[in-house]
Swiss-Prot record:
Miscellaneous remark of the record: The active site is located at the dimer interface.
Gene: pdxA
The UniProt record lists the keyword NAD: yes
Annotated source species: Roseobacter denitrificans (strain ATCC 33942 / OCh 114) (Erythrobacter sp. (strain OCh 114))
UniProt keyword annotations, A-Z: Cobalt, Cytoplasm, Magnesium, Metal-binding, NAD, NADP, Oxidoreductase, Pyridoxine biosynthesis, Zinc
Gene Ontology CC: cytoplasm
Function comment: Catalyzes the NAD(P)-dependent oxidation of 4-(phosphooxy)-L-threonine (HTP) into 2-amino-3-oxo-4-(phosphooxy)butyric acid which spontaneously decarboxylates to form 3-amino-2-oxopropyl phosphate (AHAP).
Molecular function, one GO term: 4-hydroxythreonine-4-phosphate dehydrogenase activity
Protein known as: 4-hydroxythreonine-4-phosphate dehydrogenase
Amino acid sequence: MSPATAPVLISCGEPAGIGPEIAVAAWDALQGTIPLAWVGDPRHLPASTTFTAITHPRAVADVPTGSLPVLVHDFAAPSTPGHPDPANAQGVIDVIAACVAWVQEGAAAALCTAPIHKKALIDGADFKHPGHTEYLQALAGGRSRAVMMLASDALRVVPTTIHIALEDVPRVLTPALLRETITITHAALQRQFGIQAPRIVVAGLNPHAGEGGAMGLEEQDWIADVISALAASGMNLRGPLPADTMFHARAREGYDAAIAMYHDQALIPIKTLDFDRGVNVTLGLPFIRTSPDHGTAFDIAGKGIANPTSMIEAIKLAAHMAARHV
């Protein structure tokens, strides 16, 4: 199927979270504009949902208007909002794998993943991966490293290290890792965002980007060298820059994406600037994957108050990237 007709798949995520309800709300907002299919157990959808069960993504085109196409994957148990059931953990994992298989074979244009709850997956299925992104990388065969971008109209930002303790960042952060992160980001901005000459800024690790060695040595010992070498190859790069002055409005006008050194250095600014509209994008995979930039929100699941905006933006961005993907 071509990207124009192939659907974006929405994986169910943790069925006891807000994933099912925001997926339905997003489909309702976008139906008629982007072909979509939800993948999971229909018992986990809001009770009022009108849906049509299908067995292959190509059948989305045959589903009547006003009915959610559902690629049915039977789970072990029903779900109770706010209370994850360990019996359903393997089902969550298997749905992600099924979606990846369909996207990789070209039956679907892209994957938009609803939030998972890692502890529930560990408790119920001995999940071995630090997070969603790392599992997707494994499903892709580990051919390249998956890089997490957080994107909105206000900012695109990429953390070089992701789901590790802050005390481990200096050890895990290496010249090779930073070089690969910048290179993958640069390629994705060209291929999937249509930016032919991306402008990228790189944060320092330490306060004030080390302040000449007074507050840390990584910037002068090797971060600056990595940036200089890649700039010499033709990339438009600046850095290392103090992270505390990289994200104000005027600074953001000067770049297309920012590279951060660790998780919170990247996620705090985007969630402050555009909390409801942020999208998690996985770069470096052989397929397109986006996700809303929030978690399962067990405390409000099933109450009808979850905001679907980030899911809507994630689906729209997935479709946009699929149309540009080369």
